[in-house]
Structures are given as structure tokens and as C-alpha cells.
Amino acid sequence: MEESEDLRRATELWRAAYRYQMEGELDRAIEHYQRSVAVHPTAEAHTFLGWSLSFQGRLEEATAECLRAIEIDPDFGNPYNDIGVYLMQQGKLDEAIPWLGKAKQARRYEPRQFPFMNLGRVYLKQGRWWDALREFEGAVQTAPGDVHAAKTLHQLRGQLN
């Protein structure tokens, strides 16, 4: 019973942290995420803590939080995608590819199209146009209502024709 109460409290804390993060209050968000993982570590809290840290340019710490999230729940796809994005931000495109691939394969991931979009961006930067096209097609197939994904796919098709 105590563990479920801890999990409930930890979830409340990371949800509050997420709200602070969306309002741009990063320090307050980070504090709440840290309190959440102190009560009961969850993959979500570690991932979102990493995300907040990344907005402060603290990419090594952000990556470490994502690795902790993966240890807790290897089926949660968000930390794989986030590590891929942090590597992209550092110009480490080849290193980002396997992380984004793992995010695509994860059982639990929302929004599902993000790793496809990010992998497509990697391939564009590498000049791998047809690989990028396949990824953007995968993004649109995964999330047909995503206007940004559809627009990106349309633009790339136009450039390739």
C-alpha cells in the first residue's frame, strides 16, 4: 500500500513539474521533478527532468536522466528519442540514429511520429534524401493528422521531383 501511495504522490509531483515547465518556470519544474524521483523514481519524471535540463543547455545531465528512465522502464520510448535529439543538438548525427531507432520500436511512446521526424531530420542533414523521405512517410502514416509532418513530407517530395 505504501508503494502505491508513493507512486501517486510522485506522479502528482511530476505532473505539477510538467505544468511549471510548460509555463517556462524551469527551475521550479526541475525542483518538482527531483522531488518526484526522490519519492518514487519513474521513467516519466526522469525523462521530463532531462527535458527541462536540456532547455538550460545541460545536455550531459539530461542524457543521464534519460538513461535512468530507460533503466526503470525500457519500453518507454521518450527517453530514447530525447537522447537522440540531444546528440543531434551536439552535431553527433551518427550517434543519434540508433537512439531514434529504439524510440521508433518502443512499445510505449507518444507522440509516436516524433522519432520518425527526428530521424528524417538527421538523414536530411546527412544528405540521405531517400532515407529521410521514408522516415517522413512513416511519420505521416503514424500520425495522419500531424500537419507539420505532412507539410515536411510534401516539401521533401517536391524537392526530390
Cite the ranges covered by each PLM segment.
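Structural signature of tandem alpha-helical TPR/SEL1-like repeats
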Residues: 22-32, 56-68, 90-105, 114, ...
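Structural marker of alpha-solenoid helical repeat scaffolds
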Residues: 38-39, 72, 106-108, 142
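TPR alpha-solenoid repeat register
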Residues: 45-46, 79, 113-115, 149
